[in-house]
């Protein structure tokens, strides 16, 4: 499996989460997920202000061969979406750990502890 950034947390459903200095959490899809999907052609991102629950599907990524839900790894409010990806979804393929999809202001930052570290994610992704 490709290099997994150690500073991120990972959901079993192949999303990554990165805690930012302002207390928000940026969310994207893993390299494993983008490889499985292939070339992305469209992203449907959640609306800013939307409330989400951990594990809830709130975005969609579409590739030339499939569409997949993207789940929020944390409960909270969507506070930003990466509008730059609307015209360039291929950035997710090129740089999955830089191309965040949306940011959540979590209700309980402790939910981050329920997510996997890089080694834990590597184990489930290789199954």
UniProtKB/Swiss-Prot annotation:
<dbReference type="InterPro" id="IPR002930">
    <property type="entry name" value="GCV_H"/>
</dbReference>
<dbReference type="InterPro" id="IPR000089">
    <property type="entry name" value="Biotin_lipoyl"/>
</dbReference>
<dbReference type="InterPro" id="IPR011053">
    <property type="entry name" value="Single_hybrid_motif"/>
</dbReference>
<dbReference type="InterPro" id="IPR033753">
    <property type="entry name" value="GCV_H/Fam206"/>
</dbReference>
<dbReference type="InterPro" id="IPR017453">
    <property type="entry name" value="GCV_H_sub"/>
</dbReference>
<dbReference type="GO" id="GO:0005960">
    <property type="term" value="C:glycine cleavage complex"/>
</dbReference>
<feature type="modified residue" description="N6-lipoyllysine">
    <location>
        <position position="65"/>
    </location>
</feature>
<comment type="function">
    <text>The glycine cleavage system catalyzes the degradation of glycine. The H protein shuttles the methylamine group of glycine from the P protein to the T protein.</text>
</comment>
<keyword id="KW-0450">Lipoyl</keyword>
<dbReference type="InterPro" id="IPR003016">
    <property type="entry name" value="2-oxoA_DH_lipoyl-BS"/>
</dbReference>
<dbReference type="Pfam" id="PF01597">
    <property type="entry name" value="GCV_H"/>
</dbReference>
<comment type="similarity">
    <text>Belongs to the GcvH family.</text>
</comment>
<dbReference type="GO" id="GO:0019464">
    <property type="term" value="P:glycine decarboxylation via glycine cleavage system"/>
</dbReference>
<comment type="subunit">
    <text>The glycine cleavage system is composed of four proteins: P, T, L and H.</text>
</comment>
<dbReference type="GO" id="GO:0005829">
    <property type="term" value="C:cytosol"/>
</dbReference>
<protein>
    <recommendedName>
        <fullName>Glycine cleavage system H protein</fullName>
    </recommendedName>
</protein>
<feature type="domain" description="Lipoyl-binding">
    <location>
        <begin position="24"/>
        <end position="105"/>
    </location>
</feature>
């Amino acid at each position: 499996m490709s290099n997994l950034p150690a500073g991120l947390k990972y959901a079993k459903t192949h999303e990554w989460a990165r805690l930012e200095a302002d207390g928000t959490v940026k969310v994207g899809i893993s390299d494993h997920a983008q490889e499985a999907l292939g070339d992305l052609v469209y992203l449907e991102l959640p609306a800013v202000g939307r409330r989400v629950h951990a594990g809830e599907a709130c975005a969609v990524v579409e590739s030339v061969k499939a569409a997949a839900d993207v789940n929020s790894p944390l409960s909270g409010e969507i506070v930003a979406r990466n509008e730059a990806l609307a015209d360039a979804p291929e950035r997710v393929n090129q740089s999955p750990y830089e191309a965040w999809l949306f940011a959540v202001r979590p209700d309980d930052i402790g939910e981050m502890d329920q997510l996997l570290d890089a080694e834990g994610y590597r184990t489930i992704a290789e199954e």
